[in-house]
């Protein structure tokens, strides 16, 4: 398929999750409706991951595409119908007998994801070492956490040009090369193993002064070192604390098998969240989630959340923006050369600010223009003018004067306060 056809096929998937309720805003949101180029809901401005959208198949396709053309093809299966790679997510079902007065019932726990290891006891140990609120038990807070992290850490628009907004053929080509590069140089999946088993598989490299590994002296020294090593504790690469004997650890092949992590410590070095499904990116001796690895390589547009592959983009408020996406967060009007105000780290044009966000003057009860000076005390504001910031009793101007605030009113003296009480 040539680049022009790829560009034509692009779309953000506006039908996915349409009308789904927002788990954060509740009834304040009318239901999920994807903005035409931002990755947020048009109604409540929250991301798709904050809505109750059933995306298991879509997420499995996304991760399947991530593992395509990598050494992790054992974790994917291609559908016969369309040839799209699907993530073979390992689901673990545990059954525990529960004693009752008359008979024994079975309690079933389903984990929506579990480490792909043959030893189920090891997988169960791994799960128990995670914080309870992050264990991906179906229908639980932990399952919702995993779903949210899949969306946050591994955005589809960081690997698939068809999920991006109006890329040029040149940008599509650059993105494909970028994805190919990080798949070959940084992408990895953690291994859950017992440290003692790893020692048997991967011999330690030892520096023995004054002897060669093949000499009897060297062999004796190695045996001493081996015995000594068995007595020592393994330390987590993240927290530096010792691993308990018999507890599973996580290894990352790209980091080298001399490093290991507690299950709860296998986190992104930027956002410090658990690396979802143990999918990591390794760079400069650090673990990253997909999002923050890409952020370390490319600028990301604060408007559409996509990586920027264009040579021309703008920087404002310590953030990067596609030229066409430096827009008002409320009405989407382009802000280049216009007055804007930052509201919760989002740029808003002056008309929208006055209409939707401006504070109201306690004196004249009109919105306060962002360019006009004002006086603020607690949650109350006034125009800093002789017409507005006045004693509520005698109308004396209080600019530069001492005043007594009382429930939105201000007084110049105790006497004036008493007159109004």
UniProtKB/Swiss-Prot annotation:
Residues 234-297, 299-359, 362-421 form the LIM zinc-binding domain. GO terms for cellular component: cytoplasm; focal adhesion. Residues 92-199 form the PET domain. GO terms for molecular function: zinc ion binding. Scaffold protein that may play a role in cell adhesion, cell spreading and in the reorganization of the actin cytoskeleton. Plays a role in the regulation of cell proliferation. May act as a tumor suppressor. Interacts via LIM domain 1 with ZYX. Interacts (via LIM domain 3) with ENAH and VASP. Interacts with ALKBH4, talin, actin, alpha-actinin, GRIP1 and PXN. Interacts (via LIM domain 2) with ACTL7A (via N-terminus). Heterodimer with ACTL7A; the heterodimer interacts with ENAH to form a heterotrimer. This is Testin. It comes from Nomascus leucogenys. The lineage of its organism: Eukaryota, Metazoa, Chordata, Craniata, Vertebrata. The gene is TES.
């Amino acid at each position: 398929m040539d680049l022009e056809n790829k560009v034509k096929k692009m779309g953000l998937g506006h039908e996915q999750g349409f009308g789904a309720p927002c788990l954060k805003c509740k009834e304040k949101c009318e239901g999920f409706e994807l903005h035409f180029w931002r990755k947020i809901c048009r109604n409540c401005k929250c991301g798709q991951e904050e809505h109750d959208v059933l995306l298991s198949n879509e997420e499995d396709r996304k991760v399947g595409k991530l593992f395509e053309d990598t050494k992790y093809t054992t974790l994917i299966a291609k559908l016969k119908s369309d040839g799209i790679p699907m993530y073979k997510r390992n689901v673990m079902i545990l059954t525990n007998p529960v004693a009752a007065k008359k008979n024994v019932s079975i309690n079933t726990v389903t984990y929506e994801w579990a480490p792909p290891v043959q030893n189920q006891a090891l997988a169960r140990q791994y799960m128990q070492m995670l914080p309870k609120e992050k264990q991906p038990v179906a229908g639980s807070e932990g399952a919702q956490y995993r779903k949210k992290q899949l969306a946050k850490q591994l955005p589809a628009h960081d690997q698939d040009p068809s999920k991006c907004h109006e890329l040029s053929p040149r940008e599509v080509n650059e993105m494909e090369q970028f994805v190919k590069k990080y798949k070959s140089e940084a992408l990895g999946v953690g291994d859950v193993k017992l440290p003692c088993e790893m020692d048997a598989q991967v011999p330690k490299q030892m520096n023995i002064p004054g002897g060669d590994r093949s000499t009897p002296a060297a062999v004796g020294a190695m045996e001493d070192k081996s015995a000594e090593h068995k007595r020592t504790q393994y330390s987590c690469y993240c927290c530096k604390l010792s691993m308990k004997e018999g507890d599973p650890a996580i290894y990352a092949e790209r980091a080298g098998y001399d490093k290991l992590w507690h299950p709860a410590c296998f986190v992104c070095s930027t956002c410090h969240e658990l690396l979802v499904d143990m999918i990591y990116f390794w760079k400069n001796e650090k673990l990253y989630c997909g999002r923050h690895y890409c952020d370390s390589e490319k600028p990301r547009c604060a408007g559409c959340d996509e990586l920027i592959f264009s040579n021309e983009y703008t920087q404002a408020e310590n953030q990067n923006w596609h030229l066409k996406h430096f827009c008002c967060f409320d009405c989407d009007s382009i802000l280049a050369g216009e007055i804007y105000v930052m509201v919760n780290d989002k740029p808003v044009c002056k008309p929208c600010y006055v209409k939707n966000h401006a504070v109201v003057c306690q004196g004249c009860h009109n919105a306060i223009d962002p360019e006009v000076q004002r006086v603020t005390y607690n949650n109350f504001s006034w125009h800093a003018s002789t017409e507005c910031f006045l004693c509520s009793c005698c109308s004396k101007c209080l600019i530069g004067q001492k005043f007594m605030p009382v429930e939105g009113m201000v007084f110049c003296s105790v006497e004036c306060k008493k007159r109004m009480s």
